[in-house]
Amino acid sequence: MRAPTDMPSGPERRERRRGAGRGRVFLVVAAVVLFLLATSLRGIAGFYTDYLFFDSLGLQKVWSGVLGARIILGLTFTGVFFVLLLINLIIADRLAPKFRPAGPEEELLERYHQAVGRRSGAVRVGVALLFAVIAGSGVSSQWNSWILFTHRVDFGVTDPLFDTDVGFYVFQLPFLSFVVNWLFAAFIIIFIVTAVAHYLNGGIRVQAPLQRVTPQVKAHLSVLLGILALIKAADYWLQRYELTTSTRGVVEGATYTDVNAQLPAIYLLLLIALLSFCLFIANIWRRGWVLPVLAVGLWAFVAIVAGGIYPTFIQRFQVQPAESTKERPYIRDNIEATRAAMNLGEVQTQTFEYDENLTAGDLIDNAETVGNIRLLDPGIVNDTYQRLQADRGFYRFNDLDVDRYEIDGRTTQVVIGARELNEAGVPQQTWEGKTLAFTHGYGAAMAPANAVNAAGQPDFVVSNVPVESPENIPIDQPQLYIGEDQTGYAIVGTNRQEVDYVSDDDETVPFEYDGEGGVRLDSFVRKAAFALRFGDIDPLISDFVEDNSRLIFLRDVRQRVETLAPFLRYDSDPYPVIVDGRVYYVLDAY
């Protein structure tokens, strides 16, 4: 045992405990920082590699434009919410009663105030900032609506219901509706947080026997409820315009029930919202909460009956029994709008005389049309293409399409499919095999849709590996690095030769990429960023990867195009075309 004189004194022991406590705090903080850094690095890598993708295609302005819109929206809405909530929290502190009568809740509240002490201002700012970040976190996803809103163009065509230019519905209504809905949700949060602040300050006493809410607090909360009513009134005003895209009736757009039941109900709800605003404001000078309860009760009743039950009743018992009569003018409006949108306003109707009895002369006179009657169905012959033309297990025909090409001097319907890479069939299921060696598909297969060979199989005009094709449909560069449902990534231009194809005698024919596609891996930072993005360290440490190597990712056609131009709507089926000796993909956009 140590002698008492050897024992540390009281101050020394306290100093050691403080030092140990500081050490534990440091370790906890360091662990939290390392965790946040590790989880955020991958996000930063994804952000940076997205920029490299756009930069490799010369589309930096698209990337920066979308990013700028996201930042503006996020900062603006976060800032607005922060200011609104902070103002209300400051008001709540200013309205706090100077004397809090003793009660069951006083002990708990006293502990809160002792803990906060003089840091109440910092607490207000911290709470406001926390909720502001939450409220503004998802706003950046509305960047497309914001860009449309700021670049409105009038179409010169008005809708038949409100006589408003169609450009308003395309460019402005979506963003305005979002803003109103966001404001309504924001003020609900502000109301709740403000009410909690009043409770902590003693302005609301749940267990008080008499006055549970001070007059000042009641006035503050009544104003917030009035603001909510005004925002909802604005929402009802915009809901009128949203009826023009209703899907309730037989056609898209406002139909009988929308115009004669839903629209009057919306006007009534708008008036109820304005009346509720007046009742909430009047409640400032009245005792109790009778007026707010009356307003909310009336509002809920009208919303259920007029906004829900009544339109449903009209649709079921007035419209459906006589739909052709009730909906006729709205169907006519829909047809006229469709013609205007498709530029079919000048359609001329002609009557053709025809005879249902087909003769040999008719067949001779229409030999070209008859000769192009399709015998091959893309959905049925896909397995045949796979069996006859996939050549190896690492190729596949994801899907076949119908197109027209000139064959033997005649425009002919053909069934065409791209011979894409099948990653699951790659013989070397290693990182090197799937990423460096087997990197691409090869060419296409094409057969006339109106003919088969003697064996009843497609009569291929473009076929085989290496590609065989007629002179007018050459394929000089058959390598396909992207495709339909193509996943993963490929690194090309490495010192490990790619497999172009395997010949009939099982000899591997190599290929060396000399194109400009993909992102150059010419720095440690780029290699590390892609390693983080894909959760794969090999791009960073592989000896095969050189400064001239390029990484090709986002290889699915639709995903790639949607990333580059997310403001368009795309058809679900890309289709391959052979142009200038190469296989391209076409994806229709609207």
Predicted regions located by residue number:
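Soluble extracytoplasmic regions of secretory-pathway and membrane proteins
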Residues: 3-17, 24, 30-55, 59-590
